[in-house]
Each structure stands twice: as structure tokens, then as C-alpha cells.
């Protein structure tokens, strides 16, 4: 999940902050101190995060493009200049441009906006931007909500009392609301000083940049791992009173399945699984991603001497061409698999399925899967030439049938004309006539288009009166019968208006075999 740090470099950030016993600080210095702390934490505990830095006043500038080199980011902090007035809309437009150019519109991102709470003056101020929100067209729309999934964290170099006194807090809260409620505002508790700034950025780290550590288990084997990026809580829409579901810190492998059987399933998110090496005393050595070559070699030497289940599992899945089903929580599963990063390098990945008993319909209920040895005969065949999957659904899925689409008038007109063409060819086209008639009837009932049924009924009655003298007598009977059935369905009552009811041909006999002879 990439991060964009957005630093306010307007003149208001140069306002002095009295600090007892030391030289005078500016709010800009407090912001630099907090960001330095954040970058140091990420360099140690969140090394895989791609981070960019944007500065803004009335305009915006990309100081550092997306990188994992936190030394470059810290150097950029020391080269920041002071500019003119604040324009938050310009900054947010810059963020949108930077993220979409690098990552597109589907990758979730985190935005850390560091400002002093001053909203600017005149045109370009946040007050003006929000006041004209409903007067814009698509060409100059406000950048929030972003076109990509995002969380907006606003770090204010001011305390709560100062923001409330200037009404700035209300406008900043509007930004979070415009971002679909995704994000949070952080303020300094107490007086403005380095210690309180550290405390504020510490809260941000706890919320967004704490690494997710877990224990990967399979039977008696286990391994400490880091899951990156950290999995987000999931809220299911189907529940009446939904609660966010979080994955367990104990990830238990419950079985293995062929890659061909799992296919390419829909997933909520994908994560890298990294082994955490521990020394003999149980202290954490790390994931092997060290800052310099000397530390990296030392960490790799230590990690290489210790057997690790995570490494064993990764290699086995890669060689055998299988995935591991892993229990994430109650009625919630995911899969572990090897994904090639290049010709020589691959990574152990974890994908999260939708919570539920049957996340992948072609596998059936996950809890009912079992080992091959439980089956009476090998479901894959003696020569491994067949598969028990996919399971055939009990009911036909909607996509297995021809769906009736009436988005345009021409689609409805075509379906009605098809019925009329078959009506003129009765009784030869009796089966086709009733098939098309029932298809139109079901679609009309599904859409609540009861007037259509009455209209088609009137058309069939008219066709009946226009039949030529040479027409087969059965045609008139079938048309009258179909028209009457549609008229009953158009009332919406009785069994004739039921969706599952089908109109069947009227049974007639013109052979004379059943007539009485004198």
C-alpha cells in the first residue's frame, strides 16, 4: 500500500513556537521532526512500503518520487524551502496525479497530510473550495474522493483548542467525509513541543504503520512471519449488524489443493509473507531486508543456519504446483502460494477470500473438503487424468441461461416481433412460440412490467382476428389461449401471475379420432 507524504511549506508553517530553554522553533521544524521519526520507523519496520513526498503552498511539487530509500526522503526534508499561501485543493490534485500515474486507480494508498491547520485566504482557500463544491462540472471537480481507494491522515501542527478557535477543524473533518470517511485527523495534545509531536506521530504509526506479525502453523511445524501489507479489517454487507472481521495472528494451514483446481479465484487482497528469523535467545533478527550490505550478510548468515518452516512450505508449494488453504478466522479462509517475481526469484504470497462457508462455489463448502485418503477411490484417477472439481451446482446459475436485456427499445421490439412471427406460423412453430412467450412473460414479471403483458395479449387477439381463411384452426385456438393466459398474468394475482408458472400449449385434436360416429 503506497504512501504519499504531503508537506505544507506555506508561510504559515514558519510561525514561531516558543520552546522553553532552547532556541525558537518553527512549526515547520516540528513537522520535519515528526516526519523524520516516521521515516526512521518505516526504514526499520516497514521497509517494503513505497513512499513519495509532495510539498505544496499555492502550487505543488513532487520532491521525491515513490521509493523505498528512506535516506533520500530524509535528505529531502532538510532541503525544503518556504513559499506563499496555502492551497489544499492544489495539493490534493497533485496527490491524485502522482498516485494514478504510478499505480493506477485500483491500488489502495495512504495519504499523510502535514499542515498547521491554516486553510488559506481568498480564492484557492479550503473555505472557497468547499463552498463551490456543488457548482463544479466534471472538468474541474474537487479531487476528493480520490479515484483510487485511499485513507487520508491529517497531521496538524496545532492543538485541538487552536483548531476549534479558528473553525479549521470543521473544514478538515469535511475532507475526511468527502474521502468516504476513510482517514483520521491527528492533533498535538497539550503545548506545541517536540515530545508531543513525537506522541502524535506515534499514534499514526500505531494506526497505519505497525507491521502485522503472525505465526504460520501446519501440524507441529510453525514459523514466525510478517504479512505485508498489513491486512485490513473486512466488513461483510450481508450481515444485519456488520462488525469488522480481522484475521487471526495464528494462521493455520488446513490442507493443500492443486493450482489447477483452485484456478484464479476472486480475492479481497494479496499479501507478501516473510519469515522472521529468531536467534537462539528468541530475539527477532528480522526479515533479511537490512539497510546495508554488512548488516544484510550478517542477518542472512544467521537466518540461513536456522531451519524455517515458512521457507520449507514456500519451496514445497513451488515444486509440487499446489496451494495451501489457510484458516484466517471463523468461517474465513485464504490461500498461500508461490508467485514468481522474476526468472530466479519467487515469493510466498497469501490471498484472502471473501468470509463465508463457500467462498469458491466450484470447491463447495470449505469445511467439507477432506484428504484424498478419505475417498473410496482416488478422485483424480489412477493416472491423475481427472479432477473432482468443479462441483456441479444444484441450481442453474443465471449466467448459464440467455438473459433478457431491454436496455434499449430495440431489444424489447425485437422480442415482441419474434413472438408475432412465430404466431403467424402456427401450428408448425407451436413449441418455439410458447418458448419465446414464456421468456418474455418471465422478464416482464421480473421487471414489474405488467402493462407489457396486457399489450402483447391485445396484439395476439388482434392477430387471431386477422388470420386468413386458409389458416389451420389450431392457430386461432392457440392464439386465444395465449392471449387469455397473458391477460391473467398481467393482473399480478393468482397462480397465473407466479414467476415460475409456464404457459403450456392448449391440447387440441383435429384428427377426428376422438369424435363420436353415428
Curated annotation (Swiss-Prot):
The gene is ints14. Component of the Integrator complex, composed of core subunits INTS1, INTS2, INTS3, INTS4, INTS5, INTS6, INTS7, INTS8, INTS9/RC74, INTS10, INTS11/CPSF3L, INTS12, INTS13, INTS14 and INTS15. The core complex associates with protein phosphatase 2A subunits PPP2CA and PPP2R1A, to form the Integrator-PP2A (INTAC) complex. INTS14 is part of the tail subcomplex, composed of INTS10, INTS13, INTS14 and INTS15. Mg(2+) binds at residues 10, 12, 86. Gene3D superfamilies: von Willebrand factor, type A domain. SUPFAM superfamilies: vWA-like. InterPro entries: INTS14 (IPR039841), IntS14_b-barrel (IPR045814), IntS14_C (IPR046471), VWF_A (IPR002035), vWFA_dom_sf (IPR036465). Component of the integrator complex, a multiprotein complex that terminates RNA polymerase II (Pol II) transcription in the promoter-proximal region of genes. GO terms for cellular component: INTAC complex; integrator complex. Coiled coil: none annotated. Residues 2-204 form the VWFA domain. This is Integrator complex subunit 14. It comes from Xenopus tropicalis.
Amino acid at each position: 500500500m503506497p504512501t504519499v507524504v504531503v508537506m505544507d511549506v506555506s508561510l504559515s508553517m514558519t510561525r514561531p513556537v516558543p520552546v522553553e530553554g532552547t532556541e525558537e522553533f518553527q512549526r515547520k521544524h516540528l513537522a520535519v521532526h515528526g516526519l523524520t521519526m516516521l521515516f526512521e520507523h518505516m526504514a526499520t519496520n516497514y521497509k517494503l512500503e513505497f513512499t513519495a513526498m509532495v510539498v505544496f503552498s499555492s502550487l505543488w511539487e513532487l520532491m521525491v518520487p515513490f521509493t523505498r530509500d528512506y535516506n533520500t526522503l530524509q535528505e529531502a526534508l532538510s532541503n525544503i524551502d518556504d513559499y506563499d499561501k496555502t492551497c489544499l485543493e492544489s495539493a490534493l490534485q497533485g496527490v491524485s496525479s502522482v498516485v494514478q500515474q504510478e499505480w493506477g486507480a485500483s491500488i489502495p494508498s495512504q495519504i499523510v497530510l502535514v499542515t498547521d491547520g491554516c486553510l488559506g485566504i481568498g480564492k484557492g482557500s479550503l473555505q472557497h473550495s468547499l463552498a463551490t463544491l456543488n457548482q463544479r462540472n466534471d472538468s474541474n471537480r474537487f479531487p476528493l474522493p480520490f479515484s483510487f481507494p485511499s485513507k487520508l491522515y491529517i497531521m496538524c501542527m496545532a492543538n485541538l483548542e487552536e483548531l476549534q478557535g479558528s473553525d479549521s477543524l470543521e473544514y478538515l473533518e469535511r475532507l475526511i467525509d468527502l474521502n468516504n470517511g476513510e482517514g483520521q485527523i491527528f492533533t498535538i495534545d497539550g503545548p506545541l513541543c517536540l515530545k508531543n509531536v513525537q506522541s502524535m506521530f506515534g499514534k499514526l504509526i500505531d494506526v497505519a504503520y505497525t507491521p502485522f506479525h503472525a505465526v504460520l502453523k501446519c501440524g507441529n511445524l510453525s514459523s514466525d512471519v510478517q504479512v505485508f501489507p498489513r491486512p485490513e479489517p473486512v466488513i461483510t454487507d450481508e450481515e444485519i449488524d456488520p462488525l469488522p472481521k480481522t484475521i487471526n495472528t495464528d494462521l493455520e494451514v488446513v490442507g493443500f489443493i492443486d493450482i489447477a483446481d483452485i484456478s484464479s479465484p476472486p480475492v479481497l487482497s494479496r499479501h507478501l509473507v516473510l519469515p522472521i528469523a529468531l536467534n537462539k535467545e528468541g530475539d527477532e533478527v528480522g526479515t533479511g531486508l537490512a539497510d546495508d550490505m554488512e548488516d544484510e550478510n550478517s542477518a542472512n548468515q544467521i537466518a540461513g543456519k536456522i531451519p524455517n518452516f515458512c521457507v520449507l512450505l514456500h519451496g514445497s508449494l513451488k515444486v509440487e504446483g499446489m496451494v495451501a488453504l489457510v484458516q484466517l478466522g471463523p468461517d474465513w479462509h485464504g490461500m498461500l502460494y508461490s508467485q514468481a517475481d522474476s526468472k530466479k526469484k519467487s515469493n510466498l504470497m497469501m490471498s484472502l477470500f471473501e468470509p463465508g462457508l463457500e467462498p469458491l462455489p466450484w470447491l463447495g463448502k470449505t469445511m467439507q473438503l477432506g484428504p484424498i485418503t478419505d475417498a473410496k477411490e482416488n478422485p483424480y484417477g489412477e493416472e491423475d487424468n481427472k479432477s473432482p472439481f468443479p462441483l456441479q451446482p444444484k441450481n442453474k446459475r443465471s449466467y448459464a441461461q440467455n438473459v433478457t436485456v431491454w436496455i434499449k427499445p430495440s431489444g424489447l421490439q425485437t422480442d415482441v416481433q419474434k413472438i408475432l412471427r412465430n404466431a403467424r406460423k402456427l401450428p408448425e412453430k407451436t413449441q418455439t412460440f410458447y418458448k419465446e412467450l414464456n421468456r418474455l412473460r418471465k422478464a416482464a414479471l421480473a421487471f414489474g412490467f405488467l402493462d407489457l403483458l396486457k399489450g402483447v395479449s391485445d396484439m395476439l387477439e388482434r392477430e387471431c382476428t386477422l388470420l386468413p381463411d386458409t389458416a389451420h384452426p389450431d392457430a386461432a385456438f392457440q392464439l386465444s389461449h395465449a392471449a387469455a393466459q397473458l391477460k391473467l398474468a398481467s393482473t399480478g394475482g393468482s397462480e397465473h401471475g407466479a414467476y415460475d408458472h409456464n404457459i403450456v400449449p392448449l391440447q387440441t385434436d383435429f384428427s377426428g379420432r376422438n369424435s363420436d360416429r353415428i
